[in-house]
UniProtKB/Swiss-Prot annotation:
Transmembrane segments: none annotated. This is IAA-amino acid hydrolase ILR1-like 6. Its EC number is 3.5.1.-, 3.5.1.127. It holds the Pfam family Peptidase_M20. The lineage of its organism: Eukaryota, Viridiplantae, Streptophyta, Embryophyta, Tracheophyta. Mn(2+) 1 binds at C175, E211, H433. One of its GO terms (biological process) is regulation of systemic acquired resistance. The gene is ILL6. It comes from Arabidopsis thaliana. Residues 1-24 form the signal peptide. Gene3D superfamilies: 3.30.70.360, Zn peptidases.
Amino acid sequence: MDNLRKLNLLSVSLTIIFVSLTIATNLPFFEVKYPNNNPFGMLLRPTPIKNQSLGLPAHVGSDECRVWTKACSDEILRLTYQPDNVAWLKRVRRTIHENPELAFEEYETSRLIRSELDRMGIMYRYPLAKTGIRAWIGSGGPPFVAVRADMDALPIQEAVEWEHISKVAGKMHACGHDAHVTMLLGAAHILKAREHLLKGTVVLLFQPAEEAGNGAKNMIEDGALDDVEAIFAVHVSHIHPTGVIGSRSGPLLAGCGIFRAVITSEDSRGAANLLLAASSAVISLQGIVSREASPLDSQVVSVTSFDGGHSLDVAPDTVVLGGTFRAFSNSSFYYLKKRIQEVLMDQVGVFGCQATVNFFEKQNAIYPPTTNNDATYNHLKKVTIDLLGDSHFTLAPQMMGAEDFAFYSEIIPAAFYFIGIRNEELGSVHIAHSPHFMIDEDSLPVGAAVHAAVAERYLNDKHS
């Protein structure tokens, strides 16, 4: 037993010496593993130096970039536009596009991401929110800044005829989340090569179920924002020309909610009043915005569904109506929610009827407005202009679309921005959620570079 213990201790000592020499001589690193949690039975598994397959050395970047200059931005662009790197970005995006997965079903997408992170030597935690990933690059200490990408596809049959069309019937990446994942992996590749320059930690969040509305909330509940002090994210835009970044300070995307009202009458003779009561309620709902909202504060209430039965000679015993509401501030948004319930219940009450209103809050169907913090927006704008030039940054208009990135922006300073994919020659002009939606892949390296520069420079600025 004593001889065996001495032999094991000798093995440990030799391992430590070997690893030390490996690091000192910059030889391929050997990863230490402990089988069965036994420190006296270590195995050595050779691991190649990361990033070599894409033509990047393990560490890239001058120490002069510890104080940011235009040369540092140019260095990131040079790394991004290496031919092997651009080709890799396209391969990754096309693989994800061919294999779309719906909310909380992104198992193969997540597997691909983890495979790429493993290849780059990037640490991560998995799973969060069922299929999500929290990876990190840098010192491992504060400050922590996050960049997020969503992973899920939509239940849409792709109508674009091209070599890499969706292989899954009835499912399609029709909102660009395949590009979002690719851009964040591209940023990870750049940041890993420049890890020795990072004055803190960059957190990479790969999030499921943006389209379902509760992916972000579940990620937060599972610790995605632990220690994080600011967060950034991008979304492709068919409005902006390829490679142009658009954003604005303050509210950028609207808060969005849905509602459904079931109208009934306890009086059997009141059935004839149900349609009249419901119709009156619809008209009154339209008056909330036109009569109560400021014309300078954009709000929307729309009734989009009305079911009053199908028989032509029998009055219904129930009428169901529903719709959506949107606003750019929390105060206006929740005022609309309150007034919708009041108007529905009071208006049908005039006709002796009752209304039960459901806002589907338990199903996470309410998104708050997505609001950009002034400081994070200004940081994004400064970094983008230094990286790409004045012509590649534009003030984006407020949009009535909604995004569950809003849940992050409610907790910490955030900046959400658009990257242009519009290219009329390619036919990349269709709105998201269209079966004809496609992107100009020239946007991929731009998004990767902006992500990387925004994150690295955020850490730099915190220490300046």
